[in-house]
């Protein structure tokens, strides 16, 4: 089983930006953690990141018929990218939206996700482990 993890803007600056919100772990730490945990449960995980909306859409479209599921952290695009919403809907691949912080306890403008309705579920507030939760949920759903 293959799962694609897509990270949006500024996720590459983990460990540098807003450590009080996102923690001390770096983006490299996150990628290693996700791949290692996926491997433990028999999942091949590919991780990608872009700060550019169009590239994220390209990642999604390139995944069509190539992966079994997607975990996506759209970053700030969560709150306004109809284009990413449309891309998720168009590829018909089970997708879980993940956020390191709990977006529902953050600033008002961060509490609404326009991309989550295109996904089968949303996980937020569990730090890096939220990605593992998303991968595990996809594995369980796809194995039925």
From Swiss-Prot:
- List, alphabetically, the InterPro entries matched: DHquinase_II, DHquinase_II_CS, DHquinase_II_sf
Name the cystine pairs.
none
Q: Name one Pfam family in it.
A: DHquinase_II
The top of its lineage is:
Bacteria, Bacillati, Bacillota, Clostridia, Eubacteriales
**Record's protein name:** 3-dehydroquinate dehydratase
Functional description taken from the UniProt entry: Catalyzes a trans-dehydration via an enolate intermediate.
Q: Which GO terms describe its biological process?
A: amino acid biosynthetic process; aromatic amino acid family biosynthetic process; chorismate biosynthetic process; quinate catabolic process
Which protein family is it in? Belongs to the type-II 3-dehydroquinase family.
Please name the source species.
Clostridium acetobutylicum (strain ATCC 824 / DSM 792 / JCM 1419 / IAM 19013 / LMG 5710 / NBRC 13948 / NRRL B-527 / VKM B-1787 / 2291 / W)
Q: In which pathway does it act?
A: Metabolic intermediate biosynthesis; chorismate biosynthesis; chorismate from D-erythrose 4-phosphate and phosphoenolpyruvate: step 3/7
EC identifiers of the protein: 4.2.1.10
Q: Give the EC class as a word.
A: lyase
Name one molecular function that GO assigns to this entry. Answer: 3-dehydroquinate dehydratase activity
